């Protein structure tokens, strides 16, 4: 093992001892042979200083001591309220990703290496002192030679080896927890670390962030709701991002917003509208909408516009997920818990063999108390969190896109009620969802979907043969995973479309019309059944 990795291990051990995290570990229901280990740990042989801190505070302080990679892991973990006890999740939300800036000469050297030009050849002004600094990157203000005011985001040098070492230790801890603790297995710690690994490496690629920002800007081009700064692609590289500099009021600066007479009710409602527009219209949403990434334009405070930055983390939903999510929300607010349970099974989010009655009862037990509150006080994010927590007890598959969505909704909801405490999220969102559902079922949309499915008709014979071969295999008894179930559903709808079109063509005339209309009727009926079946 490399010396650096060994030193890192000793550092982790010292922090564990300092904040008595071993006490938290041995409080878990571990096997006897692991619990026996506490008697051979030298630092447990002597009295230790008592810490007048909650377990969540001790964990938070330990992560802060371990540095930026562990801090960011704790921040991401804090969004998994479906996995964590509430007291720990609340403490982890307090983690601040603030670290001292790295040397500006290093920053300028890296920019020149990435751009292949001297700073003075690209920028007429470059501020050596950074505007902001975080664990992954820091930002400098500058002006392009062409006159545009910009910000230059630069990845910290030497991050990858540090991230690799810290991730290796996180995976070791996660695998040990999964192996030796039944409670830990329910939390899927290895999956959580794997999600973090993908997120942190994605954040190291600034071209990905630039592409996300360009997509979001295009989706809201000309919109009064949201403005996204311009990306200057000529000067973007994997470790350098150049964007338009924006000037606005941070969304949590309530005093300044009040001074400029901002319509706070409209601002809060527009935040909700932006969220649902991203999720249901665009299926592409900014998944890191914490207050540090959101500003409010100083123009037209009576019709306020949001400004979003830092598009490193985004999410998207499939059309099936969009549909099931909307139906779940409607069913929940109607207290139709059987429908909620059935939708979870139909979507493949929980296993097909789940007992519907038991699942319905569990959802009712957890969610019914929520309706003791007035409708305007009900939290959408809490609704989703409770549903996911309940579904996890029934072996719900981890859905990364839904976890991102729940995190984003909690952020938007908390922010909206901070701006306007009487915000009624359901009444604000309901018209949008109802309009989206109507548009989804409109003849124009149905015909558009039918047209896209018809494009697959040339492949129908091969797909039919493949499906029959799969069904004839002895191992075909194994339950299909959710993604495969959706593909098979899509194939059956395509087959239904082919029957429907074939039946119509047969009915209006063709080489077989001497047989009468009954074959056409059968084909149309089969087609309709296959298309609308659940």
From Swiss-Prot:
The keyword Transferase applies. The active site is at 288 (proton acceptor). Keywords: ATP-binding, Cell inner membrane, Cell membrane, Kinase, Membrane, Nucleotide-binding, Transferase, Transmembrane, Transmembrane helix, Ubiquinone biosynthesis. GO terms for molecular function: ATP binding; protein kinase activity. GO terms for biological process: regulation of ubiquinone biosynthetic process; ubiquinone biosynthetic process. Pathway: Cofactor biosynthesis; ubiquinone biosynthesis [regulation]. The chain crosses the membrane at residues 23-43, 490-510, 512-532. Its main location: membrane. It is found in: Cell inner membrane. Belongs to the ABC1 family. UbiB subfamily. Is probably a protein kinase regulator of UbiI activity which is involved in aerobic coenzyme Q (ubiquinone) biosynthesis. This is Probable protein kinase UbiB.
């Amino acid at each position: 093992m490399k010396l650096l990795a060994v030193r890192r291990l000793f550092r982790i051990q010292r922090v564990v001892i300092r904040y008595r995290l071993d006490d938290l570990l041995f409080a878990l229901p571990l096997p006897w042979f692991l619990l026996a280990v506490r008697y051979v740990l030298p630092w447990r042989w002597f009295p230790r200083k008592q810490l007048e801190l909650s377990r969540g505070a001790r964990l938070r302080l330990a992560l802060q001591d371990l540095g930026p990679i562990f801090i960011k892991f704790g921040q991401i973990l804090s969004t998994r309220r479906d996995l964590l006890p509430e007291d720990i999740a609340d403490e982890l939300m307090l983690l601040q990703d603030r670290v001292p800036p790295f040397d500006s000469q290093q920053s300028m050297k890296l920019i020149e290496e990435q751009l292949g030009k001297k700073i003075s050849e690209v920028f007429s002004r470059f501020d050596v002192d950074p505007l902001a600094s975080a664990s992954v990157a820091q930002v400098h203000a500058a002006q392009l030679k062409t006159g545009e005011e910009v910000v230059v985001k630069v990845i910290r040098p030497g991050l990858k080896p540090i991230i690799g070492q810290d991730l290796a230790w996180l995976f070791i801890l996660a695998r040990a927890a999964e192996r030796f603790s039944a409670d830990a297995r329910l939390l899927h710690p290895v999956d959580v670390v794997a999600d973090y690994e993908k997120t942190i490496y994605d954040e190291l690629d600034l071209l990905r962030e630039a592409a996300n920002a360009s997509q979001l800007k295009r989706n809201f081009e000309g919109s009064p709701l949201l403005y996204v700064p311009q990306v200057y692609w000529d000067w973007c590289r994997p470790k350098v991002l150049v964007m338009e500099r924006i000037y606005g009021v941070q969304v949590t600066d309530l005093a300044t917003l009040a001074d400029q007479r901002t319509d706070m009710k409209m601002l809060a409602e527009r935040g909700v509208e932006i969220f649902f527009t991203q999720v249901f219209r665009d299926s592409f949403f900014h998944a890191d909408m914490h207050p540090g990434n959101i500003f409010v334009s100083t123009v037209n405070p009576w019709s306020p516009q949001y400004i979003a930055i830092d598009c490193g983390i985004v999410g998207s939903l499939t059309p099936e997920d969009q549909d099931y999510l909307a139906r779940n929300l409607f069913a929940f607010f109607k207290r139709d818990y059987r429908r909620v349970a059935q939708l979870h099974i139909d979507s493949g989010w929980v296993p097909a063999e789940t007992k519907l009655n038991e699942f319905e009862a569990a959802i009712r037990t957890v969610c019914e108390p929520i309706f003791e509150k007035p409708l305007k006080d009900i939290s959408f994010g809490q609704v989703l969190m409770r549903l996911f927590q309940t579904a996890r007890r029934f072996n719900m598959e981890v859905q990364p896109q839904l976890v991102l969505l729940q995190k984003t909704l909690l952020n938007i909801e908390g922010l909206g009620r901070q701006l306007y405490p009487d915000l009624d999220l359901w009444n604000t969102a309901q018209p949008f969802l109802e309009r989206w559902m109507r548009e989804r079922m409109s003849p124009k949309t149905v015909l558009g979907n039918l047209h896209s499915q018809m494009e697959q008709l040339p492949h129908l014979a091969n797909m039919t043969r493949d499906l029959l071969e799969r069904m004839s295999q002895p191992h075909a008894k194994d339950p299909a995973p959710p993604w495969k179930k959706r593909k098979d559903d899509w194939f059956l709808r395509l087959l239904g479309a082919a029957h429907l079109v074939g039946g119509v063509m047969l009915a209006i005339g063709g080489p077989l019309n001497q047989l009468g209309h009954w074959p056409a009727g059968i084909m149309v009926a089969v087609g309709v059944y296959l298309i609308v079946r659940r």
